[in-house]
Amino acid sequence: MGGKHQGSGAGASSGGGSLNSSLCNSVMTNATTASSSLTQQQQQLQAKYIKSKRHQSRYTSLQHSGHDSGSYLHLNSLWSIWYGVMLTLFQGYLAMHGAYRFLGCSLIPWKIEPVAELNLQIVLSGVVFILLPVFFTSAVFKVGNLANDGIKLATGARERRCTLSPHDGLEEESRGGTLRALWTHGGPTAAFVHIVIALCLLLPRLLLEARIIENGLLPKEQIWATELDFVVINRRNLMAMSVVGATPFPRHHQPSNQQQSHHQHGRLNLTANSLEQDEEDYFNDTMFTAIRGVPAGGNNNLFDLRPDRMANGRKAAKTTATTRTTTTANKLDAGKGQYFEVPDLINQDIDEEERQELEEAIRGEEDDGDEGVGVGEEGTVIMPDFDELAPRTAVGTSTTTAKASSDADKLNVENWQQLGTLGKADASSSSSSTTSTTTTTTTSTTTTAATTTSTRGTSTTTTTTTIKPMEITTSRQSAHHHHGKSRKHHKHHNKQRQQQPPRRHHVASHEQAILESFPEEETTTRDSSIHRVRPEVLPELPIPSTPVSASNSKIIAIKAKNQKRRISKRAAGVEIEPEYLLGDANINSSEFVAKSNEEEPEESEDFELEDGDFQAVPALTPAPPAEPNGPKSGQDYVRLDGFAGMLQLFFGIDKPIDVAIFSQPPSAEFVNLLCALLVWSVRYPAVFWNTSKAFACVFSLQMVVAALDIILGYVGISNLYKLQIYAEAMPVHQPGLILNAVVTLALYLLSTALVLASSMVMYLYGHGRLATRMRDRSIITLKTHQTWIYFAHCASLCFVLALAVVKAPLLNDLSATYKNNLHCPTFLAALVGVTHLLLWIVIWLCLTIKRRWHFKLPPLDSTYGGLLGKSSAQPLLMSSGQRTGSNSSSSGCNSTSTTVNGGDSKPDMMSTATSTELGMGMGMGIGGGINGGMGGTGMGLAAQEDIYWPKLTPSSPKLKVTFNEVTSTSDDVLLIGDQEQTDGKRHTSRGASVCFASATGEVDDGEYATLRAATAGAVVGITMGSMKRGLSNTSVGVSLLHLSEYDELPPPPPANLHHQQQQQQQQQQRQAHSFAHGHPHDYANLSGLGGISDDNISEEGKLLACVRDDSITYASTSDLEPPQPSAQAPPPPPPLPIKGAPVPQPPAVMPHSAGIYGRAPQAMPEMMQLSPEHHHNPLQHSLQHPQHHPLQQQQQKQQTPQHPLQQQGNPHQHLVSPLAPVTVAVHTNEAHIASSSTPRCLRRADSGVPNEALTPRSDTTSTTESTNTTSPPERAPSESSSGVHSGEERELEVIIRPRANSKPPPRPPQPPIQEEPYGRCTNMRMSSFNADPAATSSAVINSATLPPQRSVPEQKFDYTAHCSTMPLPVGCHSQQLAGSGNGYASTSAMTSSMGGGGMPPLPPSQVSSFMTPNSMHYANASVALGNVSGQQQPHTTLPNGVRYSNPHFLRRLPHVTKAAESPYGHLGYGAGHHAFAKLPHETHPTIPEDRDSANYSMASDQDCGLYVTAQLH
């Protein structure tokens, strides 16, 4: 379980950012929630240092597993629990019974002790006891197997809340190796173990039953007993009846019939003698003779399951015409009542002696033969009268050839072959021979047909079957006494039979040889009263077919009294199965003939031979004989030694087992197997029931047929096995059998294993199709090679070939057996085996033709949040809608993630890897720590989902804020992020307007500056710094984290501060910073994302301190800090990665900048959403949602380019902290401002972005900070440091570049950032700030998807005027805005907003106007963006055509707040943002001049999406 959970957890972590890890996410669903409880700092740190996605996933899964409930045992479904309990008890009982069977069989006196079978019985019983705990555990508890745990594929989160739910591999490849995959996707564990236990219980029973039959403890007919006899009527038993009819036969038969009936009645009375005789008859019947008369042994037919006594006539499944040459009627005394006389057409011409001999032989043959036919010496065959009222069947009379033996042989063989023919006219003779079809089964109650052969006018009838040869001998002697003259014949017959049995033991070749010698022996047989009728013919025919050969070999007139001898003879010569024993019968007859011909052994000899035969053929003894044997063998109490003796003492067993239990179908073991296969065939296909009932039904149908194949295969194989074991003792002529007992059993077990494995092939097909559908509908996933889709087809082909090879020999033996005995279960076994193969081929042909299946799939949110088990493993996707403001991303995960991936041309891969590392690291760490306060779970998830930030432009590790003409690293990053978000590709054009590839900082850099707060080191520094600082530090990490925290946790404790001036804002920032650990976490993520992106993408992340013509780069994040802490703000944070600088600066700048910065991402949405100073909570919530969304996008972008940094930064600020510093940098990028929501970015706005932009950046400090931001760019740098969470952000450099051309401040000071929830178009990137036409063009490219409307309002704002540090000619901004299609302006705005207001501050007046109405509410560029957005309708043209009005969407598409006044008024708001194609998320009317482009740019495009959505909400 633990391993499974780990695997799924690993999948979840890696799938945290990916929609592909449905199982992982599902496993992580609760785990993620619980993980938020973990110390976020630890999580962040651990996530940072986890370099491998798999390792991070494992770590996350371990955390989740620990937090899931602390319990590794999860109960299965109720019905499964009861199934486990009941079947465990039942199988425990069967195992105990197996031990009892072992002891009971050990006490039986065996002629040939089955040591191997007994040992196997006790060993397998022990194995069952070992497997029972496994079965119970897997049935009652969840073990990570989909089918066993009752998990339905492609279901919602509610189905998959259990953390132990394995990874289903639908959304993404499952973790783990082949063994884990087999464990997860294999058949139901409990049912599989159940099947194994059932086979372990069933096989020993079969082995012992075969040995018992071999030893004669059970009648040979038991060979044909099956587990399905309670359902299927044995056809052979019906065949005799159908053939038998009233036989008006010669007077001879009637008297002899009377005598026979008398004898039979005596036998029926089951006197001791009669029993013995019956046993003898039974043995004779078991001889290989084709014709099994119903002589004394009654059970001559192997097919007849009934004991000889009880089913004398039934035994002949196939009735063979027996030829009787005896014409004397009075010799057929026996069988009058029970046997019908059939004219012996074959023997009519034979002399009475010959006839008598033939009759005796026939009787022996009859005993041996399937038919219980008594043949009168007169030439009539006496058929056992099953009903006794049934008329005797009249057989056409035909003259028998002079050679009764050869003719009789032929006739018998022919009759056996004919199985349905009553008579055969062999010669024209008055004597009649009765031919009964071997197909007929006699059901007469008499065990043996007693026929009287009167050679001298005396007729004797023997109707006894002897269990033991000795007993048989006795009975024979008595019979001989009764018979008088017939004794002689009987002796010969017995002798012959005895001789024959040895030959029986011989192989068919021996039998044939014997048959060949028959003619010579036949003569002797005639003398010995065995007619030569069968000798020659039988050798020929016997091989092919029937017990007739036996009758032919010794067409022993079945004398009622001599029957005993006859039976004994037959016992020696009769084959167990007439059907198989055709050849054997011939052999027997030849043997008997030879012996009888050569020497007419005395009865004693015959008895001895018979005894030998019986010993050789123990199975021949009917059940009744077995009883006598049983007492003999078990009379003495045997004390066992060793382990058996210990068990004997334990169970107190001192008596041998009653072998009768083996003949009572069905056995409990067989029922247990039925139950196991039923559960298997239903529960395995059930995994597809919710998603595709049609496929589940097809799957189940195939499995039901497979189960039938296993069940009926066992029935057929059991018959084969018993027959082969018996043949070892009593050689049976087996014309078609090519296997021995061991190989037969081994092949059956192998075929069973293949059939069970075949179900996995069908499952593989269905799972592959479903996984393809699940992944195809997720834009995030790339459709790659589908070559494996045909793997299932190849596997099915291999299965068919393997199963055909294994089953071919078995089917051959089954068909050969059925051909001889017409055994219905044998036929069904072969038929179902072939049908299964054909059905498999047909099903797979259909599956190959059917290209598409209709699968019912859950909603994407449900899939990712529920199936993934993490309720949206991606914070952006899930947080804004589900938990934090970034849930907009969560809900829009598919669309947003899709857009991001589609636009960024990065599928889940980046989100998975980045989100897994950053999301898991930051989400789990930051989410745990930061979100611990505000909703750690949401953030934790958000952190994972941050990967889906549209801003997947981490390709540029540098975050640049460039003004219109200037292409800066920050711009590259931002552009990359924006373009990824917008176009699905990263544009590294430095001239491009604002690149807020990094979530907050980078984007916030906007056109002017990008705080490079999110390099790996910077992120780590931020995280560390934020942790040092306290709540905000912990969650966000240094300065960036503070801003991002505020973004994530928009409402700092003092909501008024947001409305208030810088001090209030600073306080809020501090509070927000403190909140950062908790609520700001989401914003921290956003900022962090920005920072990370910035670090990865922009030079500004490096804290470049240089001013380009059109861009200003602040070496320290302090430059971008909101001016509120003047001291803090002025000190430009060194271009250190966020790690170093942010920590120092956060204290001073943190309070202010944290509030501002944190609010910047949140502030704008906050203002848009909540104009009240309560924006902290609402902003936190709303901004968290939107912020999270953009942050996630940014994180994705950031993570992709600089995965390590992102991981580190993300863990701290939940992917936002890195961005936060960046956000500080850019005012121009309102989107950056919004995304970063970093007040520092607002200060950076000093460098060129209106203060208002800064104000929106910071929630509380927005107004004051705007004013401060209005302060010289130095403040902006200071703000960069502190506003960007200098402590965190110092690592993040803010490059404030005018980007006059590329990012003219599309948002001139937007002092009145209208409180429009959508007002802050953080998506709007102030790409117009980029001075470089190239940047502009790239920005335009980014905004290609966006409607030109953003570029339409090209509000030229002299960013330079607003940001002294980032002076940028208005013309440049306009140019860039125009050149970039106003995409840069919007991009800058977004980046600025994302950056957290790091854009150059707007003029104080602008700031105050903007900040007062909006910054108070929004306290950051998001407000400005919102206003701009308000002015300009949000672009609905996202890369995926989705409109981002829902905060749940992560669309990081640069929300160009449509030419809303960009911080650079000359460019116009739209110009600043139009570059972001993804901006359509929502175009918030932006106040062209009300908010500075710095605010816009400060909101990263990603953040913009979040903030805008938040504002919209």
From Swiss-Prot:
UniProt feature, compositional bias: Low complexity: 427-466, 879-903, 1060-1071, 1179-1208, 1255-1285
Compositional bias segments (type: Basic residues): 478-507
Subcellular location(s) of the protein: Membrane
Entry keywords, A to Z: Developmental protein, Differentiation, Membrane, Transmembrane, Transmembrane helix
Residues exposed to the Cytoplasmic side: 1-77, 142-181, 690-696, 758-787, 848-1513
Main localization, broad class: membrane
Gene Ontology annotations for the cellular component aspect, listed alphabetically: membrane
InterPro entries assigned to the protein according to its UniProt record, in alphabetical order: Ommatidial_diff-associated (IPR053291)
Membrane topology: Multi-pass membrane protein
Amino acid composition bias (Pro residues), ranges on this chain: 1122-1149, 1303-1314
Presence of keyword Transferase: no
UniProt keyword Transmembrane helix, yes or no: yes
Source species, domain of life: Eukaryota
Transmembrane regions listed in the UniProt entry: 78-98, 121-141, 182-202, 669-689, 697-717, 737-757, 788-808, 827-847
Ranges of compositional bias, category Polar residues: 1324-1335
Location of region: Disordered: 247-266, 354-373, 383-532, 879-913, 1045-1090, 1115-1155, 1173-1214, 1231-1335
Residues annotated as signal peptide: none
Extracellular compartment residues: 99-120, 203-668, 718-736, 809-826
Known tissue expression: Expression varies in tissues throughout development. At stage 5, expressed in the embryo dorsal region followed by expression in a striped pattern at stage 6. During gastrulation, expressed in ventral region and ventral nerve cord. Also detected in many neurons in the externa sensilla and chordotonal organ. At stage 16, expressed on the surface of the midgut. Additionally, expressed in a subset of cardioblasts (Tin+ subpopulation) during dorsal vessel formation. In third-instar larval tissues, expressed in the eye and antennal disks.
GO biological process: cell differentiation; regulation of eye photoreceptor cell development
Compositional bias ranges of the Basic and acidic residues kind: 523-532, 1286-1296
Role: Involved in eye morphogenesis. May be essential for the normal differentiation of ommatidial cells.
Record's protein name: Protein tincar
UniProt organism field: Drosophila melanogaster
